[in-house]
């Protein structure tokens, strides 16, 4: 049914495609002078619901499903960081994902602020809650943009306000790395069973006791503990962790989604019949308890560097093409060698904080592409191996950052329906469902991002033999 609906308007969309040219840009990088201390600040802004009668569609599972109530409102959280020179912003939005067009609007709104504060890089990512308002446009009725314009304006305003507040909150302190492994909480819904079960914490401890501490928490799981029947607005477990840490310690929290493709989820912690809000409560409590259990930390030397590169991703997915030219997806499209004749312009980045490097990935990357476990000969070199060659000791993933390309799938395990490519899913010979490919740009995305990762690392590190 879905296939026939989209095929009915595909031809008319293609006939209206504009002719665009390539817009490749040189990589950008900044390496801060040797610092004596860390400077960080945090701010958080609620994203209010618009006072309109226009529908608010929930982001995930089914199209055209409207939000019926509120558990907790989405927020924009921001952290400023520097080592005494130019600064960097990380802005985390409690939402399912953001296209590069929305990210660029936030950057444009902050352009004067960045000049005034010597901010060299603004990076915006989504925590990937599936209980938020549709911010990508994919969950409206068929062929209808699911985004609510007024809500998107509120989101951008909250992100900008949080960014400015984070700078105003800037204070001096030290930065510590700690880890823990929450017990039996994750599972992978697709073979191979590969995921990173470690919860990583970067904890900023201010020199003055009157300043709040800041915790950056990286964990690789879809934020969907409320599951698919839910129609209540919520930040899901990233919000529950933030609230729990605040109540227990007074510290502020910025949640970073890791390598969640594949599809990595938290287990259900309640018995039948399933109680969504109770499952959220238990998941949040389990993760908060895990964070508070971290008792061994390593202090990071105050060094900061960042690099990014525009990447042209061949667009093979005809459904994404339709969304793009119906105005649902706002990613820039250029002439390219994708099966559609186009490429999407995206962005990959790296942020090095002491001996910890954050890979800023524009989508939901499969964990195999990071660890190397379960990869085949046709797959790119895993990001962890590339990082090791550049002397990187600790590699963390920040998914859905500065763009949302969908799932980033290993080529060796990439399968599409030959009768309805990207429109309908397919099972392989083992019965494995290859759903994720229908929400991906194409088979070459993983390799191109790995190449870009190598290139931008070379701007801020010295490769080892």
Each model region followed by its residue ranges:
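C-terminal motif of bacterial Sec signal peptides marking the signal peptidase cleavage site
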Residues: 18-22
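Bacterial N-terminal signal peptides that target proteins for export
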Residues: 1-10
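Conserved beta-alpha junction segments in alpha/beta enzyme cores
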Residues: 27-125, 129-288, 295-465
């Amino acid at each position: 049914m879905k296939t026939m609906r989209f095929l009915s308007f595909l031809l008319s969309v293609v006939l209206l495609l504009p002719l665009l040219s390539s817009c490749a840009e040189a990589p950008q990088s900044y390496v801060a002078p040797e610092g004596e201390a860390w400077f960080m600040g945090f701010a958080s802004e609620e994203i209010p619901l618009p006072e309109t009668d226009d529908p608010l569609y929930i982001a995930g599972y089914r199209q055209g499903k409207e939000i019926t109530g509120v558990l907790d409102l989405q927020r924009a959280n921001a952290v400023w960081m520097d080592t005494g020179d130019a600064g960097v912003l990380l802005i985390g939005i409690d939402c399912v994902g953001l296209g590069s067009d929305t990210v660029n609007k936030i950057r444009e709104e902050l352009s004067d602020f960045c000049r005034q504060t010597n901010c060299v890089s603004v990076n915006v990512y989504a925590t990937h809650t599936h209980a938020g308002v549709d911010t990508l446009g994919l969950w409206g009725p068929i062929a209808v943009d699911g985004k609510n314009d007024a809500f998107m304006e509120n989101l951008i305003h909250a992100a900008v306000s949080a960014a400015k507040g984070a700078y105003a909150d800037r204070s001096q302190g030290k930065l510590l790395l700690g880890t823990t492994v929450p017990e039996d909480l994750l599972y992978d819904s697709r073979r191979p069973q590969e995921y990173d079960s470690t919860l990583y914490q970067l904890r900023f401890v201010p020199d003055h006791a009157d300043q709040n501490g800041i915790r950056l928490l990286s964990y690789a799981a879809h934020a969907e503990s409320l599951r698919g029947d839910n129609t209540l607005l919520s930040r899901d477990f990233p919000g529950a962790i933030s609230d729990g840490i605040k109540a227990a310690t007074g510290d502020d929290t910025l949640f970073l989604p890791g390598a969640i493709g594949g599809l990595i989820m938290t287990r259900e912690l309640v018995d039948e019949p399933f109680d969504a809000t109770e499952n959220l409560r238990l998941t949040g409590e389990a993760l908060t308890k895990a964070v508070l259990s971290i008792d061994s930390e390593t202090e990071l030397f105050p060094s900061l560097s960042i690099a990014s590169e525009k990447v042209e991703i061949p667009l093979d997915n005809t459904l994404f093409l339709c969304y793009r030219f119906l105005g649902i997806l706002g990613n820039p499209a250029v002439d390219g060698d994708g099966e559609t004749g186009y490429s999407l312009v995206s962005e990959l980045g790296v942020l090095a904080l002491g001996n910890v490097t954050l890979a800023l990935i524009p989508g939901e990357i499969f964990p195999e592409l990071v660890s190397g476990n379960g990869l085949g000969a046709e797959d790119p070199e895993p990001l962890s191996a590339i990082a090791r060659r550049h002397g990187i000791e600790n590699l963390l993933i920040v998914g859905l950052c500065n763009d949302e390309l969908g799932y980033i799938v290993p080529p060796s395990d990439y399968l599409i329906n030959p009768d309805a490519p990207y429109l309908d899913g397919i099972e392989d010979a083992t019965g494995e469902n290859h759903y994720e490919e229908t929400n991906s740009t194409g088979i070459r995305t993983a390799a191109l991002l790995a190449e870009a990762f190598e290139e931008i690392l070379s701007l801020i590190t010295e490769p080892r033999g």
